UniProtKB/Swiss-Prot annotation:
NCBIfam families: PRK13660.1
SUPFAM superfamilies: MCP/YpsA-like
Native source species: Streptococcus pneumoniae serotype 2 (strain D39 / NCTC 7466)
Name recorded for this polypeptide: UPF0398 protein SPD_0338
Matches recorded under HAMAP family: UPF0398
Gene3D superfamilies: 3.40.50.450
Pfam family, one: YpsA
PANTHER family: UPF0398 PROTEIN SPR0331 (PTHR38440:SF1), UPF0398 PROTEIN YPSA (PTHR38440)
Superkingdom field: Bacteria
Family: Belongs to the UPF0398 family.
Length: 175
């Protein structure tokens, strides 16, 4: 059973503040293409942390593909309090993360930074790969976790990059 941890830029990181942003269509097209390849490579479980942006868009696409590709979806939140202060629209998105095949919380609430380190280590040890929208030239808080992934032995990282999106956009506009 191959499992992929899904992580990537937040909508804020990308400057995408509307679900109707035309760039989302292109991002979701790239996600669909990547998920098809991952399914062909034997990935059956997609593991989310409940973050808005890339993770949520992958969740949306994976739910559309679930029946055809047999994906199982899991959300492992760091804390039970995750998203409790989000606005109503984001609460709706959070509820989709909670309506998957498997949901767990690592901790009741944040108490110290060691929890996040242990949570990240748990995610790495319990997945065989990751699907990551991250570009080293556009660093965010994912930089540390990305380094840990690269240092994890026998851990495959499938990346979506801005270059890939630009190439897809060029091909998309030519058709």
């Amino acid at each position: 059973m191959a499992t992929a941890l899904v992580l990537g830029y937040s909508a804020f990181d990308l400057g995408l503040f509307s679900d109707k942003d035309p760039r989302l269509k292109l991002i979701k097209k790239a996600i669909r293409k990547d998920l098809e390849a991952m399914a062909a490579d034997g990935v059956s479980w997609l593991v989310f942390t409940g973050s808005l942006g890339f993770e949520y868009w992958v969740l949306e696409v994976a739910q559309e593909m679930k029946t055809e590709y047999g994906f199982q979806l899991a959300t492992i939140f760091a804390f039970e309090t995750h998203g409790e202060n989000w606005n109503e629209g984001n609460q709706m998105k959070l509820s989709r993360f909670k309506q998957v095949d498997f949901v767990k919380y690592a901790y009741p609430r944040y108490e110290h930074k060691g929890q996040l380190r242990d949570y990240q280590q748990f995610l790495l040890e319990n997945t065989t790969s990751s699907y990551l929208f991250y570009d080293e030239e556009n660093e965010t808080k994912l930089a540390y976790f990305y380094q840990k992934m690269k240092n994890q032995e026998d851990y495959f990282i499938k990346r979506l990059t801005f270059d890939q999106l630009n190439e897809l956009a060029e091909n998309f506009s030519e058709n």
